[in-house]
Amino acid sequence: LFLAGSGVLFFNLITHSEEWAMNKANKHLYTSGSLTTAGDILDINGKVLVTTKDGSRSYNEDKSIRLATLHTVGDSSGYIASGVQTAFKDEITGYSLKDGVYNLQRYGKGNDITLTLNAEICKVAYNALGNYKGTVGVMNYKTGELICVVSTPTFDVYNKPKDIHTDTSGKYEGIYLNRFFSGLYTPGSTFKVI
């Protein structure tokens, strides 16, 4: 009976350890449910999109770049489920089955991730979208790299609207949705590209 219980415990440790380590109650990674310590997220040119400063996540200084790349990098609270900070949180925190989050505690940050996105192109696409709801995606057809992914509506993480969760007018509808990855858009005439 003891061996069976130990076996179940060991199996659960192996199969669920990442979930336990990434739980929002883990004070090594989260403060009040927000990711506070992780590696940098960079664009293809090395421009920092998100970093850790003084125990909290800091986004790019350029407001237009923050707005344009928010759905791709994600928010620290995890509302944008398809963002890098949520989808790759085990990698940016440096989690491993062998060491857990020890390296995060030892070095003060996790692993950096460099995206194929170009932040300046995303900024131009965001400005071109204006006040329209939609998405812009640019892909290198030879390599499959995503050069630009922009989704609107968006918000500035440094000035999040206070009524975002209580609004009934619909102006924030889909604000946490990355329309490029999760939108229900029918492809147009895709053969023209070829």
Which sequence ranges carry the predicted segments?
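Short, conserved phosphate/pyrophosphate- and ester-handling motifs at nucleotide-, phospho-/glycolipid
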Residues: 192
